[in-house]
């Protein structure tokens, strides 16, 4: 059965499941799922199926309306808490407050020149800062656009991610209180890959 709200930007279910599974710590099941760029809610639906409470937001009111439809369609007889709000990523700490036992799983927005988006990069950095305020012991699992050369997955190569050398991106991640636990490329199509990134707090 198809979801009631769909857009071409919707993330494949297999990638949504992958990102959520990578956000789990050993022998620890998260309670809260937070996505500040929820889009059509593809990742949130997978988290809902896994029994998590859902806290998602988007700046686009069309997406907010659509994801409410999709989550209502997906919830079935489950008793999960679901909250969907229109909100900038820069304000999600004020929106949700402190939430222990959370994971942050998201696919940041980027434009037509996807892997060269400085705006998208700033949104990603804002998400890092806000996540630490909400839960200082959480995990972030996400994907950033990268050039197809990253599929070679040579650890000695400074690949271009979102238009910048990976070393610069990682430095910025560290400066915002996170360390990269995993970095692995995933093929999207011939000329575009996405770099799957999992981050844990530095402390």
Set out the residue ranges of the language-model regions:
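Class I S-adenosyl-L-methionine-dependent methyltransferase catalytic core
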Residues: 1-203
């Amino acid at each position: 059965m198809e979801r009631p709200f769909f857009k071409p930007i919707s993330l494949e279910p297999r990638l949504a499941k992958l990102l959520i599974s990578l956000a789990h710590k050993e022998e620890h099941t998260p309670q809260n799922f937070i996505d500040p760029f929820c889009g059509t809610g593809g990742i949130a639906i997978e988290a809902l199926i896994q029994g998590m409470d859902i806290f998602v937001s988007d700046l686009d009111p069309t997406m907010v309306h659509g994801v409410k439809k999709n989550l209502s369609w997906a919830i079935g007889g489950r008793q999960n808490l679901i909250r969907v709000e229109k909100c900038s990523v820069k304000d999600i700490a004020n929106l949700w407050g402190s939430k222990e036992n959370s994971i942050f799983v998201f696919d940041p927005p980027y434009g037509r020149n996807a892997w060269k988006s400085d705006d998208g990069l700033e949104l990603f950095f804002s998400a890092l800062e806000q996540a630490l305020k909400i839960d200082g012991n959480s995990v972030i699992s996400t994907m950033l656009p990268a050039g197809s050369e990253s599929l070679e997955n040579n650890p000695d190569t400074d690949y271009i991610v979102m238009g910048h050398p990976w070393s610069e991106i990682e430095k910025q991640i560290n400066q915002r209180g996170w360390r990269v636990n995993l970095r692995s490329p995933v093929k999207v199509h011939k000329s575009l890959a996405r770099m799957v990134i999992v981050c844990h707090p530095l402390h």
